[in-house]
Amino acid sequence: MQARRLSLCCLAAASVVVGAQAVAGQGAAPQQGVTYRSPSGTTLRLMLDETNLGNEASVGEITFPPNQDSGEHAHDAIEIFYVVSGELEHVVNGKSQILKPGMSGFVRPPDKVRHKTGPAGAKVVVVWAPGIEGRRVASRWTREP
């Protein structure tokens, strides 16, 4: 029950972030957080993490370039995606779901997940609970100036 409430709180936090960006207009919203880049060019902007929210959850914005495949992996936390733009193929334990703008998907540990994009790439808001997972993902990527 506590995990479900935490997940709902995390999703609400993501909704606030997305809503604020929509009200401000695309590209006009001030940038919050620290951005990291993976070797494949995917970026993660951690907006809420242990520095300003604590360890309960972290919220980020991930921009996947066109035609990317994350490879199968697992997380030590619940991962919730909300698609802002583009399309994301969200494959959980071999079961594929195409997520379009306004749709969400999730994965629980120890599920295996894979994220794929088509020619348009994708921008998503991601919520991890517990929040240390956001920092764990970012630790393998390069911090942007």
Specify the residue positions occupied by each region the protein language model found:
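Bacterial N-terminal signal peptides that target proteins for export
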Residues: 1-10
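A short, N-terminal "cap"/entry segment at the start of jelly-roll beta-barrel domains
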Residues: 16-56, 137-145
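Ligand-binding loop in jelly-roll beta-barrel domains
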Residues: 54, 109-134
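Histidine-centered metal-chelating micro-motifs
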Residues: 69-70, 89, 105, 109-115
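Glycine- and acidic-residue-biased ligand/ion/polar-headgroup-sensing regions
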Residues: 76-88, 93
